[in-house]
Amino acid sequence: MAIINMSDLDLQGKRVLIREDLNVPVSNGVVTSDARLRASLPTIELALAKGAAVMVMSHLGRPTEGEYNSEFSMQPVVDYLAKALSCTVRLATDYLDGVEVAVGEVVVFENVRFNKGEKKNDEALSKKMAALCDVYVMDAFGTAHRAEASTNGVGLHAPIACAGPLLAQELEALGKALDNPARPLVAIVGGSKVSTKLTVLESLSGIVDQLVVGGGIANTFIAAAGHNVGKSLYEADLIDEAKRLVANAQSRGGDIPVPTDVVVAGEFSPTAAATLKAVNEVGDSDMIFDIGPDSAEALAKIIESAGTIVWNGPVGVFEFDQFGEGTKRIAQAIADSKAFSIAGGGDTLAAVDKYDIADKVSYISTGGGAFLEFLEGKELPAVAMLKQRGA
């Protein structure tokens, strides 16, 4: 089932409603990080260039649903877009019963979460949104894993529902990495807990050639290998699960390597003194915060030989420089690799920024939860809806 792409449609004179992910941090009425806004501009500009009357909607923050709260207003986003686009951009507060929009202008709807029923994918609300447009464009990969009125329901009732360029690009990159990857396929999964990434680890251990774990997740695997992890964050109840994942990977000719050396400290703080130890020398009062240089080099070699790299999560507490060398080495190896690489997840993107490798990663995913659910092998509700409407 093919998904209809916005770029293939004739939009001349059409009312086009675009769902973007414009959920950006705002301080004192000013947008403080504009990455998502910049990512959405090409889609809005393309719709304008195609002669459409453009309406844009998004959520912003977590207001109480159904209640207006000026703290979560889209006004700062409107102010930003008004400067970035060479056309009229205005905010519409009461839009569900109809809104005037002319060809060549952009109307931004007030925060969709001010509407009661948004999160529950309310059918009456979805139909009201759908009645506003000739074409609905889903372009918000970051919210594609949520079945809500503005991301799912509206698309089921709109005359035409299609994928915007940003969403299409995202799905193409993820498909390239997971559906038909150049081998060896290497996945790096970091983060603090195995429990939050268990389904990702299970899904990936069945398709990747090499699975690398880092951060707090690695501590559980270190414990599963029989080593002391001291006072480190780990999940004792998931040790058997970790052993099963290792056995699963090895049965396919892969592995989940455990670090041979680690960086430890006695406390979690920006000023904690870092000590390098062999993995079998970790003491009862030690906390593991990073992989050591030997382990980092071993992982860099795995990355160098990869055909495809999927990166989700740092391998240490890189926010503190003394525990950032492992993640820095991984980032450098990915940057130096000629493999197709995709990075996603908030902490990962922070590491990409910190080590300045954004232009060296083949594709940077805008989705956090959606990226994870895609890695888990789940079909995202927004994608299922677009396939249904494209059939």
From Swiss-Prot:
InterPro entries, per database record: Phosphoglycerate_kinase, Phosphoglycerate_kinase_CS, Phosphoglycerate_kinase_N, Phosphoglycerate_kinase_sf
Enzyme class: transferase
Catalyzed chemical reaction(s): (2R)-3-phosphoglycerate + ATP = (2R)-3-phospho-glyceroyl phosphate + ADP
Keywords assigned: ATP-binding, Cytoplasm, Glycolysis, Kinase, Nucleotide-binding, Transferase
Main location: cytoplasm
Family indicated by similarity: Belongs to the phosphoglycerate kinase family.
This protein's name: Phosphoglycerate kinase
